[in-house]
Swiss-Prot record:
A zinc finger (C4-type) spans 40-62. GO terms for cellular component: acetyl-CoA carboxylase complex. GO terms for biological process: fatty acid biosynthetic process; malonyl-CoA biosynthetic process. Belongs to the AccD/PCCB family. It catalyses: N(6)-carboxybiotinyl-L-lysyl-[protein] + acetyl-CoA = N(6)-biotinyl-L-lysyl-[protein] + malonyl-CoA. Disulfide bonds: none annotated. This is Acetyl-coenzyme A carboxylase carboxyl transferase subunit beta. The lineage of its organism: Bacteria, Bacillati, Bacillota, Clostridia, Eubacteriales. Component of the acetyl coenzyme A carboxylase (ACC) complex. Biotin carboxylase (BC) catalyzes the carboxylation of biotin on its carrier protein (BCCP) and then the CO(2) group is transferred by the transcarboxylase to acetyl-CoA to form malonyl-CoA. Zn(2+) binds at C40, C43, C59, C62. Its main location: cytoplasm.
Length: 291
């Protein structure tokens, strides 16, 4: 009789293995794919990479401009399907037989999906036609070798032939050491071609992007009729430490940044990436009316 009132309560039993699975669910780290997040060098905040790339590779917190490759910039600036590429199959030789140079070039071509550190061609920007050269710092730091110099020189000559304005987007670590003196020759060659462009009364727009240094700065980057720069771009010839060691003086903070150069009259304006295409279009329109 008493057993009816004092029945033993039955409980659900959980095996030790199941308990272990529950514990693992709470303690194991979440699986996040590599490359999904990037840290902004400007403000230090962590950004969702897809959102940053949709924002033209600009930080949506502080406006820091991440580096763009040549194909990305081509898509940003040129009208869709308007670009016709020049000399796309020219590749580097090894004029001083630098060990491993050919392999390095092949690796860079596979990695970047371009043949050299510059893309040249003609296209339209807001329906305004121009010859365009876009350098790429992902290809051997945008270093200027014989092919880069040759492609830009040919683009300048094509600009003269077609009577079109020239726009060069620069980004470079300077001369390409693997080509020795042949690399340094390109500074004079490109500058000479641009001098002929000036004699024809044609417009040359130089757009300095991060970083523009070395022989490129010392030659064609700084001789544009109009010189624009992206915000925060590093622009200079030698590095800060080299200069300080040479002149034995402490240099001002940020003296090689675009903002410092604008303040001291070395460039004409700083244009954010979102406004760059429209700014270039307006300049081309004004130039066209002037002619």
């Amino acid at each position: 009789m008493l057993n009816k009132f004092f029945k033993k309560t039955k409980y659900i039993t959980v095996s030790q293995r199941a308990l272990g699975d529950i514990h693992d669910d709470f303690t194991k780290k979440p699986s996040i794919p590599n490359g999904m997040w990037v840290k902004c060098d400007g403000c230090g905040k962590v950004l969702y990479k897809n959102d940053m790339e949709k924002n033209n590779k600009v930080c949506y917190h502080c406006g820091y401009h991440f580096r763009m490759n040549a194909l990305e910039r081509l898509e940003l600036i040129l009208d869709k399907e308007s670009f016709y590429e020049f000399d796309k199959d020219i590749t580097a030789a090894n004029p001083i037989e630098f060990k491993g140079y050919e392999d390095k070039i092949k690796n860079m071509q596979n990695k970047t999906n371009i043949k050299e550190a510059v893309i040249t061609g003609k296209g339209t920007i807001g329906r305004e036609e121009a010859v365009v050269c876009i350098m790429d710092s992902n290809f051997m730091m945008g270093s200027m070798g014989s092919v880069v110099g040759e492609k830009i020189t040919r683009a300048v000559e094509k600009s003269i032939e077609l009577k079109l304005p020239l726009i060069i987007f620069t980004t470079s670590g300077g001369a390409r050491m693997q080509e020795g003196i042949f690399s340094l020759m390109q500074m004079a060659k490109v500058s000479g071609a641009i001098s002929r462009l000036n004699e024809e009364g044609l417009l040359y727009l130089s757009v300095l992007t991060d970083p523009t240094t070395g022989g490129v700065t010392a030659s064609f980057a700084m001789i544009g009729d109009i010189i624009l720069a992206e915000p925060g771009a590093l622009i200079g010839f030698a590095g800060k430490r080299v200069i300080e060691q040479t002149i034995k003086q402490k240099l001002p903070e940020g003296f090689q940044k675009a903002e410092f150069l604008l303040q001291h009259g070395f460039i004409d304006n700083i244009v954010s990436r979102e406004n760059l295409k429209e700014t270039l279009r307006k300049i081309l329109v004004i130039h066209g009316r002037g002619n």
